[in-house]
Amino acid sequence: MKEQKWIHEGLITESLPNGMFRVRLDNENMILGYVSGRIRRSFIRILPGDRVKIEVSRYDSTKGRIIYRIRNKDSNN
């Protein structure tokens, strides 16, 4: 049986070494997020201030995998 994961939205607050980021979730929790392999392969840039979707394990809610970067509505790209 596959492990159940929670998907949250949050804001990148800090960039750390090795593709790690500090993420503030919408429920005000701070967790450590790492970039998923699909985002890494696609060369998607994630910077502080970006909104992301993050997948969090039920067993360790202090870490999560960033699975999607939400586009900003005010950018021209």
Swiss-Prot record:
Component of the 30S ribosomal translation pre-initiation complex which assembles on the 30S ribosome in the order IF-2 and IF-3, IF-1 and N-formylmethionyl-tRNA(fMet); mRNA recruitment can occur at any time during PIC assembly. Gene3D superfamilies: Nucleic acid-binding proteins. InterPro entries: NA-bd_OB-fold (IPR012340), RNA-binding_domain_S1_IF1 (IPR006196), S1_domain (IPR003029), TIF_IF1 (IPR004368). Its main location: plastid. It comes from Vitis vinifera. This is Translation initiation factor IF-1, chloroplastic. SUPFAM superfamilies: Nucleic acid-binding proteins (SSF50249). GO terms for molecular function: ribosome binding; rRNA binding; translation initiation factor activity. One of the essential components for the initiation of protein synthesis. Stabilizes the binding of IF-2 and IF-3 on the 30S subunit to which N-formylmethionyl-tRNA(fMet) subsequently binds. Helps modulate mRNA selection, yielding the 30S pre-initiation complex (PIC). Upon addition of the 50S ribosomal subunit IF-1, IF-2 and IF-3 are released leaving the mature 70S translation initiation complex. The gene is infA. Belongs to the IF-1 family. Keywords: Chloroplast, Initiation factor, Plastid, Protein biosynthesis, RNA-binding, rRNA-binding. It is found in: Plastid, Chloroplast. Residues 1-71 form the S1-like domain. GO terms for cellular component: chloroplast; cytosol. It comes from the Eukaryota. The keyword rRNA-binding applies. Coiled coil: none annotated.
